[in-house]
A protein has these predicted regions:
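Intrinsically disordered, low-complexity linker/loop segments enriched in Gly/Pro
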Residues: 1-37, 41-51
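C-terminal functional regions that serve as terminal interaction/effector modules
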Residues: 44-47, 52-194
Length: 194
């Protein structure tokens, strides 16, 4: 698996984001997009993005093939492209509720092989808060340039990683974790205990 490193637009890897969203949009209700004021929120099953609306044409429109939704309108992936979703959940509240920002998260250079089923495997990047490991799929991790983002999370349960652009805090990504194995938990305790 070759990880893309094509970072543009405030540290976002636009090609990786578009590729991921196109794959998720193949599922009905796989991708939701809403606009609230000058911000656009994009939510999938495993990631969420908050971007300034001015970035929508460059980052999201090639996936949705639609203009940016009007303020308060949500569009959703459907059988034949994206359509307006009536009675949509409030994506802004969902984003805010799942954006842990209690503690700084350390991103490590370590990758963990993870089974994905059907004799396949994938890679996860090891993040940690103290001795608490957080594994994030490398596909999600490759969507942002680690030099241009700060990471936050919490040690309660399996914390998502909340990446915030250092140059523009209105740009952020939430990445859901993978449950670490007992081996990873032991290793993390040994490596990062003080």
């Amino acid at each position: 698996m070759k990880l893309s490193t094509n970072f543009t637009l405030f540290g976002l890897n636009v090609k990786a984001i578009q590729s991921y969203l196109k794959e998720q949009a193949k599922d009905r209700r796989g991708v939701r997009v809403t606009r609230r004021g000058d911000l656009v929120y994009i939510i999938t099953a495993y990631t969420a993005f908050k971007l300034p609306a001015v970035l929508y044409p460059d980052v999201i429109q090639p996936v949705t093939l639609r203009e940016c939704p009007a303020d308060g309108v949500t569009i959703i992936s459907a059988q034949y492209g994206f359509e307006v979703e009536d009675n949509a959940p409030d994506l802004v509240d969902i984003f805010k509720n799942h954006a842990p920002n209690e503690k700084p998260v350390e991103r490590t250079p370590f990758l963990q092989d993870i089974p994905t089923g059907k004799k396949k495997s994938g890679l996860a990047r090891l993040f940690h808060i103290g001795t608490t490991p957080i594994l994030i799929n490398t596909d999600y991790d490759s969507m942002v340039n680690p030099v241009q983002f700060t990471y936050h999370g919490t040690t309660r349960g399996y914390s998502p990683v909340y990446a915030i652009s250092a140059s523009d805090p209105t740009i952020s990504v939430i990445m859901l974790p993978i449950k670490p194995t007992a081996e990873v938990e032991v290793l993390c305790k040994k490596m990062f205990s003080e």
